Amino acid sequence: MAAVQGQGQGKLLYIVVVDDDGATFRYTRSLLHSTLQLMGCKPRHAFEISGRVFDEIRGHMGGDMAMGGGGGVQRYELAADAEAASPRQFQFELYKRRTTLLIPRPLFLRLVCHALALYKYVAPDQRSDLHRACRIRERKESVTILLCGTSGCGKSTLSTLLGSRLGITTVVSTDSIRHMMRSFVEEKQNPLLWASTYHAGECLDPVAVADAKARRKAKKRSGISTTSTIDFDKTRPLNDKPDGKPIGKKQMAIEGYKAQSEMVIDSLDRLITAWEDRKESVVVEGVHLSLNFVMGLMRKHPSIIPFMIYISDEGKHTERFAVRAKYMTLDPTKNKYVKYISNIRTIQEYLCSRADKYLVPKVNNTNVDRSVASIHATVFSCLRRRAAGDQLYDPATNTVAVVNEEYKNQCVANSMSSKGMFKLIQRLGSSRKLMAIVNVDGSVSKAWPVESSSGDGKGGSENGSKKYVGDPIYGPLNIGRAESVNLQFGAFGISAWPTDAGCTSQAGSVNESWDNANEGTGSHVPSSSGSPKKLDGHCKEIKESAAASGSDDDEEEEEEAADVPPNSGSEEDLSEEDIRAIHEEMEGSVDEDCNRSDEEYDDLAMRDCMENGFLTDDGVVHTVFDGNGQKHSTLRKRQVNLRTLSKIDLDSPDTARSSSALPISASSKRNGTRRWKRSLSESFRSRPRSAPSLVELTPKHKGSAVPEVAPDK
């Protein structure tokens, strides 16, 4: 009986958050970790903060954690008809009672904000951001992210990494929709559907295409609005030629791409409708997301946030197709993508021109890590704007100026703080704290007055309406005290802080920073004695852009886009240093260091499982209790396995842990892997901490000392 009691007091697997209206949602530790990562916390910090929240609530399982003016932590009570259920169901209800606690929503938010404050996270409206992330995770709201772009620009890689970063499990490619549609029709019946987008124009009749374009242009001149379609069969006689210019190869490639995209968009429309009804967030990527049709989808689905992915350098774009060939070759006779690279680039030029027309943000995918971070920050900023009542899609102009503005804000913020550090400072002789961007030389680039935090989680904002951050301050400041702080989304998070105009827009604060940030070729750090700038950068662009029509009737623009490539990042206007910086980057590939932070918490989960006695994802308990209810340490064999897997051996260096019995090739490969992969012990020794780790927070019971393991000789 004592063992069962000790085990019941040691386990907390579920936290049921109760709203004022009685609605509930169950959080596990991994789900809370995903929620914190969605709101912009680092993966490692999100893991530790989620564990800290569970440990704090677990310490109050015996009693109630009182909250001023509200309820506290309560145990999960059995249902009234639980005893009448089957014995198996009754045992499960007893298990849930031992492992579940109920907590009101305000107390839950306060505890998480308190843990964020301990890890030095500061934000203008941190509590509202947390509540917004919880609504997405609890499926009270949804977001649909569309990654448009041609073949080989990195959409699939971005969608996978973005889904992992946002905690979105549904990642759909339009190629899978096309593959599903192919199962209902044979290739002979519809060759257009079975063709690839870059050579779909070969399935069209140039005469029929020219005739349809001529009729559409004539009806447009007469003032009749219609959505004409192209006759895709080849039954029209070739000698029946319409009047006008002959259709070129580039224009035929675009027409074939648009024709196949139109066939796929209809099925995607129905899928998005079902996802929005279920409040399910999703990431959709694919070449079939033509921006003309995307604008039509945004009229019906307010949850859509589009992005245009492209590769500016044609040479780097071509090199990415080498991995798709059988023999890793760029020979056009053996690599169909290289064979049709001209059509692929033509489609990209067409999509870039459409993106400029509809103000869809264009992401130059020269670095996957930076692209994922910028898209993540932009998506959450759009969620803030949507919660404030702003519409992402403007039906009057048929543009998404809000999304484009927020993306530019993120890029400008990243360029502003790329060479600075975020610190919470105090001026000499003043007790007021300032959140500042401190340059490498120690000068202050920009600072914001913030309300002093008393350590109870109220440093950001206790409610969503009260303001705790003042207007920015410029000029040299005499720093008396400084401490490092963390921002949500890292360098991109500075865009959420107020500007001179009293809003959170950074679009017009730095001259020409957007061009450098968009191309990834440079950064701009404002001067420490700079003067405030006016917010007029993006407003002028919106006023000058005419109301864009969402149809394909703009023949002159389409033909011009097909013949004259737009300025989508050519190297002619760049300096030699910028060109060198572009070529030195790993364009379109994942840097070996970019995903380390996302994978570090896996090692922490392993260590936490062995030391604290439970897994974070599935709740499996590995702790052994004795007759007195005390927790024993794990076995020696488990400690040896832990040391082997996680390399936690503080008594011997890495060289002593390498086995001399292994072959030379295996040993050298192991040493080579160790040079680029950061071990868990090194991260614990070298990384400075602003809050105690989970191991230090775990209470030490008698008899739980970990046996010492002798190092391998």
Curated annotation (Swiss-Prot):
Basic and acidic residues bias locations: 231-246, 533-544
Biased composition (Polar residues): 504-531
Annotated disulfide bonds: none
Organism ancestry: Eukaryota, Viridiplantae, Streptophyta, Embryophyta, Tracheophyta
Residue ranges with Low complexity bias: 656-668
SUPFAM superfamilies, per database record: P-loop containing nucleoside triphosphate hydrolases
Region Disordered: start-end pairs: 218-249, 504-575, 650-713
PANTHER family in the cross-refs: P-LOOP NTPASE DOMAIN-CONTAINING PROTEIN LPA1 HOMOLOG, P-LOOP NTPASE DOMAIN-CONTAINING PROTEIN LPA1 HOMOLOG 1
Residue ranges, compositional bias (Acidic residues): 551-562
Function, in words: Required for the accumulation of phytic acid in seeds. Phytic acid is the primary storage form of phosphorus in cereal grains and other plant seeds.
Protein name: P-loop NTPase domain-containing protein LPA1 homolog
